[in-house]
Amino acid sequence: MVETFYEVMRRQGISRRSFLKYCSLTATSLGLGPSFLPQIAHAMETKPRTPVLWLHGLECTCCSESFIRSAHPLAKDVVLSMISLDYDDTLMAAAGHQAEAILEEIMTKYKGNYILAVEGNPPLNQDGMSCIIGGRPFIEQLKYVAKDAKAIISWGSCASWGCVQAAKPNPTQATPVHKVITDKPIIKVPGCPPIAEVMTGVITYMLTFDRIPELDRQGRPKMFYSQRIHDKCYRRPHFDAGQFVEEWDDESARKGFCLYKMGCKGPTTYNACSTTRWNEGTSFPIQSGHGCIGCSEDGFWDKGSFYDRLTGISQFGVEANADKIGGTASVVVGAAVTAHAAASAIKRASKKNETSGSEH
C-alpha cells in the first residue's frame, strides 16, 4: 500500500509542527488563504502519494532542470514524499529493460489512478521514427501510457505548443500533446522552461484537492497564467511614463527603463515571471536586463526576432516618450497656473469692490 505524505514525513523524523509549517507554506505558494491550511493538512495526512509517470519526447530536458531547482516546495519533497515518481528515464536509477518493466508494473497496478507528465512532444513524420524510446517510436509509448492515465500534465512549451522543434518548416512534424491525446484532461504548463515553483505548485494543487486546477481557455492553470508579465513588472511605471531603453547600455538602460522598444514581449505574455520569479525568487529576465521573449506563448518561435518591437499595443505610454509626456505635463501645469492666477485676480478684484462699497 502506498504511504501518505504525512507518513513519509514522520518516518523521516519530521515533527508535527514542521509538517503544519510546510502545509502553511504550501498554501502560500498556491496563493491560498490561511483558511485552506486544515484542508491541505488533512489531504496530506490521509491521501496516498499519487503515482506519476514522467515521459520524455523531443525536448532538451530544461523542464526537468527547472523542476529539480524548486524551492517552495523543494523538488526532493515532491519526488520523495508528495508523489511517487515511479518512472522518469532521466531521474530514475534503473535503465533499459529494467526501467521499462517498472513502467509496465506501475501502469498495471495503478490503472486509471496515475498522473502522466509529458516533457517534450512526439514527432509524427515517418511514423514517429525521429524519436525512439525503448525501441519504439515515442508516439506509440505516449498513446500507450496515456490510455489509463487519470490526467496528463504537459510540461513546457514543447509539450504544450510544439516549441522550437515545431518551427517552420517542421520537418519531423513535431506535435503538441493535446493534438495527439484528445480523450484525457490535459493541464498545460508552458514556458521554456516553466518556472520551478509553478511546476511543483500544479502538482501540489492536484494532490491536495484531488482535482485539476481551474484552467483558462488554452488549458493553462489560471493561478499562474492569468496575468501578463507586463501587469506586475517592476518596470511598468517607466512604460506608463514613456521612458524606454533605445539602445543596449544607453543611459536609459542603466536607469532601468522599460525594455518595450528593445522587443520585450511582456505586454502579450501570460506567466508568473514578474511575481514568482526564478532561482528561489531571485530574479527574472527583465530584471536581468533583457526583454521577455514570450517563451510561454504559442508560436513564439516563429514570430520573428526576439528584438522586434511589438506593434498594435495601444496603451498609454507606448508611442509616447519622456519629452512628449513632459511637454504635455508642462502644458497642463501651465494651464493650471494660469487658471489659478486668473481666479486669484478675480478674487482680489471682488474683495476690492466690496471694500470700496463699504467705504461709500
From Swiss-Prot:
[3Fe-4S] cluster binds at C273, C292, C295. Its EC number is 1.12.99.6. GO terms for cellular component: [Ni-Fe] hydrogenase complex; ferredoxin hydrogenase complex; plasma membrane. Keywords: 3Fe-4S, 4Fe-4S, Cell membrane, Iron, Iron-sulfur, Membrane, Metal-binding, Oxidoreductase, Plasmid, Signal. Predicted to be exported by the Tat system. The position of the signal peptide cleavage has been experimentally proven. It comes from the Bacteria. NCBIfam families: hydA (TIGR00391), TAT_signal_seq (TIGR01409). Heterodimer of a large and a small subunit. This is Uptake hydrogenase small subunit. It comes from Cupriavidus necator (strain ATCC 17699 / DSM 428 / KCTC 22496 / NCIMB 10442 / H16 / Stanier 337) (Ralstonia eutropha). The gene is hoxK.
